[in-house]
Regions:
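Perimembrane helix-loop-helix junctions
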Residues: 16, 221-252, 265, 423, ...
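Transmembrane-helix motifs of polytopic, lipid-linked glycan transferases
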Residues: 107-143, 184
Length: 577
């Protein structure tokens, strides 16, 4: 029975036939995937060049504040500074017109994507180098693993999918910056694990993690995971302590100045409040935009009860103050633990992860491929043991996904960590050396790569490039006297969209008031709508913007269509006699 279950032996003639199987040059694979990654990234950046998102408005506002020296506005405990520095630099140097402002932001995103591509190349090179010793031992034992060209192909396919499908260049967010730093830090940890690392390597690791923290506050706790893993990769306890201490020093060298400034501005020690606010919103159920609590230090001024209407003209600046610095408006609320709420949040995150791994539109291809390769192995447990050799990547990837699971998991957040997880998981593939299984591995790798790239290419917008709707509406606003510094109000639960913050940013206007429900406003009697508008006028609002109007909306009382859009404006002093 044991003989029947033992792996088939490879004879000399079999080995010679295996050597005659077609082989791909790793260099050719790398060049092809570099060109493919650049082409797909450029196509996505171009197709989405006129799009904008809420976070992007705040980062653009913050970048402007940093580069003009408005430190009171620039220091922000909700949005981290690094990405805004980059955006602000390009805006200050190139000074784009309103038409080109959002396309320039997407160009910056594309450049960061290229930097992430370079960081991933460095990481994948170190990962493959770290695999050579174990792969050589596997061959000596009569086993076969992924060939080097297979690692390059699979790695780049996963990178392209994670970068363009999960993070995307459509969104103006720092997630691509974070991905670049995660790949760079992971490469340095692999150097330490293989014995190629020095104190200089560990120092650089700390610096990279410090920059990652400046890109996104969640990297502060995750930096501790990276540093702990780096210490555990050392050859002995004494060296591990030295490595951890040096990494902490490098991290604090970069992070401590901003932590000090931020703590002084908040009058308490903090490395950022985005995590606590996320917990309030996604776990405790606090309203993101208009929090309600008797403990609020800065309650938002409610100027009309029904429909609920709020004014928030100061002291926070930015195109939309409620989103620019949520920490000010949430100050006084303390997140609290509730078992039922926590269970619900974790369950929602697990559903997100389930979809990530098991949806045909995401990464079911990789999940099925991995299961197939593990199941055809003589002992699947041996594959798991081999994957354990890549434990640093597994620990980092699972720690990040676990941290997000406690609050809120979104694909762009965990994208680089899922790449680490997949590479570590596929490193466990060890099959008996035979012609059929060598071809099976090759076919599986090619299939996963092709399907991942095909999904990404399919979802990259291929229709005519999106039009400059926000610019056209900003131009229409100027026709109604809306200029730099004008105070606006919007109607809707979230003031984003063509006639909201996205157009207000290009007009350099500020949204200082909001009617929270479009349906309630337009369904109210005419006298009630007039009272709401009068309250907005008394609050210093110059004009009210409305979009997504119901068909029954009464536009006879001074509402004007903005250009050829479906958005409308009411200008005080002109439309209310």
């Amino acid at each position: 029975m044991s003989a029947a279950l033992s792996p088939p032996q490879t004879s000399v003639s079999d080995a010679s036939r295996l050597d005659k199987l077609p082989r791909l040059s790793p260099r050719q694979v790398r060049i092809f995937f570099w060109l493919l990654a650049i082409a797909l990234g450029a196509a996505q950046a171009w197709a989405t060049r006129f799009t904008m998102n809420p976070d992007g408005i705040s980062y653009l506002d913050m970048g402007d504040a940093y580069w003009r020296g408005n430190w009171h506005m620039a220091i922000n405990a909700y949005f981290s500074p690094f990405y805004s520095w980059i955006l602000g630099f390009f805006m200050k140097v190139l000074r784009p017109s309103p038409y080109w402002e959002y396309p320039l932001a997407h160009l910056v995103n594309f450049l960061i994507y290229l930097a992430a591509l370079g960081c991933f190349e460095f990481f994948l090179r170190n990962f493959i180098r770290s695999r050579r010793h174990s792969d050589e031992n596997a061959r000596k034992q009569g086993n076969v693993t992924l060939p080097e060209w297979g690692w390059w192909m699979l790695g780049y396919a996963l990178f392209i999918f994670a970068s363009l499908q999960l993070i995307t260049l459509r969104l103006i967010t720092p997630d691509m910056c974070v991905a670049a730093f995660v790949y760079l830090a992971s490469a340095l940890i692999l150097q330490i694990q293989t014995g190629a690392g020095t104190l200089r390597t560990v120092m650089f690791l700390g610096i990279v993690l410090g920059l990652a923290y400046l890109a996104k506050a969640v990297m502060f706790p995750l930096a501790l995971v990276f540093i702990a893993v780096a210490g555990c990769c050392a050859h002995n306890v004494r060296q591990g302590v030295r490595y951890a201490a040096m990494a902490v020093f490098g991290f604090l060298l970069i992070a401590s100045p901003f932590i000090t400034i931020l703590s002084r501005s908040k009058h308490r020690v903090t490395f950022g409040d985005s995590g606590s606010i996320a917990y309030e919103v996604y776990v405790n159920g606090v309203d993101q935009f208009v929090p309600a609590s008797s403990s609020l230090k800065h309650p938002i001024n409610k100027i009309h009860d029904m429909p609920p209407t709020y004014e928030f003209g100061g002291p926070i600046e930015g195109t939309y103050p409620l989103w620019y610095d949520s920490t000010y408006w949430h100050e006084g609320i303390r997140p609290y633990f509730d078992l039922a709420q926590q269970f619900h949040a974790i369950a929602a995150s697990l559903v997100t992860y389930w979809r990530q791994f098991c949806s045909v539109f995401l990464q079911l291809n990789a999940t099925v491929a991995l299961f197939v390769l593990y199941l055809i192995a003589p002992r699947s447990s041996a594959c798991l043991k081999c994957a354990g050799a890549s434990w640093p990547l597994l620990v980092i990837g699972l720690a990040a996904m676990g941290l997000y699971a406690l609050v809120y998991a979104e694909s762009r957040y965990f994208a680089p960590f899922i790449v680490l997880f997949w590479l570590a998981a596929f490193s466990g593939v060890h099959l008996p050396h035979s012609r059929g299984l060598v071809r099976t591995i090759a076919v599986v790798v090619v299939a996963v790569s092709i399907t991942s790239i095909a999904q990404t290419a399919w979802n990259t917008p291929s229709e005519a490039p999106s039009t400059a709707d926000y610019y056209r509406l900003a131009t229409a606003l100027r026709d109604y006297g809306i200029t730099r510094g004008s105070k606006l109000a919007v109607i809707g639960t979230e003031p984003f969209g063509k006639s909201g913050a996205f157009s207000a940013r290009l007009a350099r206007a500020q949204i200082v008031a909001q009617i929270r429900s479009s349906d309630l406003f337009w369904a109210a009697p005419a006298i009630t709508r007039a009272e709401v508008l009068q309250a907005l006028a008394r609050a210093g609002v110059q004009a009210v913007l409305a979009s997504d109007l119901p068909t029954s909306a009464d536009l006879s009382t001074g509402w004007h269509r903005l250009g050829t859009s479906t958005d409308y404006i009411h200008v005080f002093g002109r439309d209310d006699q």
